[in-house]
Amino acid sequence: METPAFFFTTFLGCLLLSITGYSIYVGFGPPSKQLRDPFEEHED
C-alpha cells in the first residue's frame, strides 16, 4: 500500500470529494442567495 499509485488515487478521491462538497455548499448554502436566476429575470 506504499505505492505512488495509492497516494495519487487517494489524493484524487479527496480532491473530487472536496470539489463536490464545495459546489453543493455554494449551490444550496448561504452563498446561494447571491446567485441570479435567469429564468426569473426573463419576461415573456
From Swiss-Prot:
One of its GO terms (biological process) is photosynthesis. It is found in: Plastid, Chloroplast thylakoid membrane. The chain crosses the membrane at residues 7-29. May play a role in photosystem I and II biogenesis. PANTHER family: PROTEIN PSBN (PTHR35326:SF3). Belongs to the PsbN family. HAMAP family: PSII_PsbN. This is Protein PsbN.
